[in-house]
Amino acid sequence: MQPKFNNQAKQDKLVLTGKILEIIHGDKFRVLLENNVEVDAHLAGKMRMRRLRILPGDLVEVEFSPYDLKLGRIIGRK
């Protein structure tokens, strides 16, 4: 019998659009979200593997966990 995994954690993610304000260190960035809130975000693993370059002024998609809305993951560039 195969165990059933709950995919609820993936559905609880919150995705917002933001603009990169500054590069803090390596893969950490300060992002201004569309609702005028500044948060810190780091690159997601797939973006790090693809070695995509993110510069100040770029529009990005930021994913948040419902448990910590101050730290996000950059999952894509627009």
From Swiss-Prot:
SUPFAM superfamilies noted in UniProt: Nucleic acid-binding proteins (SSF50249)
PANTHER family: TRANSLATION INITIATION FACTOR IF-1, CHLOROPLASTIC
Entry keyword annotation includes Cytoplasm: yes
Tree of life domain: Bacteria
Protein name: Translation initiation factor IF-1
Family (UniProt): Belongs to the IF-1 family.
InterPro entries given in the database record: NA-bd_OB-fold, RNA-binding_domain_S1_IF1, TIF_IF1
Domain S1-like: 4-78
Known role: One of the essential components for the initiation of protein synthesis. Stabilizes the binding of IF-2 and IF-3 on the 30S subunit to which N-formylmethionyl-tRNA(fMet) subsequently binds. Helps modulate mRNA selection, yielding the 30S pre-initiation complex (PIC). Upon addition of the 50S ribosomal subunit IF-1, IF-2 and IF-3 are released leaving the mature 70S translation initiation complex.
Molecular functions (GO terms): ribosome binding; rRNA binding; translation initiation factor activity
